Amino acid sequence: MTWTVSGLPEGLSYNGRDGIIRGKVMESGEYIVHITAQNLKGKDSNTLTIKVGNDLVLTPVMGWNSWNTFGRSINEQLVLEVADAMVSSGMRDLGYNYVCIDDFWQEEKRGEDGRIKVNKEKFPNGLRYVADYLHERGLHLGVYSDASDKTCGGVCGSYGYEESDAKDMASWGVDLLKYDYCGAPSDRATAIKRYTAMSKALKKTNRSVVFSICEWGGREPWLWAFGKICRARRVE
C-alpha cells in the first residue's frame, strides 16, 4: 500500500514510513488535505479537514481512560499495552488518540520539597517516559488530579499547588489534565475559583494542555466553565 498526501498547510509534513502527519501550523484556518491510497487492487481518495485555531481541541477529545477498567491498579506496563492496542486495533487512526491515566499515578504524599511525586512502583520510568512512548505513536497523554488536597482515591491533590503541579505536568509532556472535585466545597463560587487557579497555572506553562473539569454538573459548569476556564467537561 502506498499513500500520497497533498495540500498540507505550512508547518506540517507527512512521513510515509509510519503514516503520521507531524508538525505545527501557525496560521488559523481550515485546511483541506487530500489523501490517496493505492495498491494492486486499485486506489481510493478522501479528504481530511485540519482545523487550526487559538483554542485547544476544536473537536471533542476521544480516547481511553484507565479508571473503570483498572482503578487503583493502573501501572506503566498497562498504559503502554493499551497504547499499543489503540494503534494496532486502528482506534488511533479513527481519532481515539488520548490515553488518560486516572487516579493513583501519584504518591499518597508530596515530597519534602512540596512537589507532587509519581508513584515509582507503578511508573518506574516516570511519566516523561510514558509521554514519549505515546507521542512516538501519535498518541496524547492525559493525567488526573483534584481541586482539593486529596483526590477521590485519597492520594495528594493539587489544591494550593496548582502552579508547581502544572509546571511538572508540562515538563513530563502531559497533553490533558482531568481535574476532579472530590473533597472540595460544594458552592459554585469556590469551584470557579479553584478551577480558574489551575486553568491559569496550565496556561503559564506555555504547553498546550487540554483542561478537562470533572465536577459532575451540580454547579452548572456549562454556564461558566467551557470556553472560559476549560476546553472539556464531564457530562453525566
What spans do the regions from the language model cover?
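Exposed beta-strand face motif in extracellular beta-rich ectodomains
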Residues: 29-33
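C-terminal edge beta-strand
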Residues: 42-54
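Aromatic-lined carbohydrate-binding/catalytic grooves of carbohydrate-active enzymes
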Residues: 68, 81-82, 86-188, 194
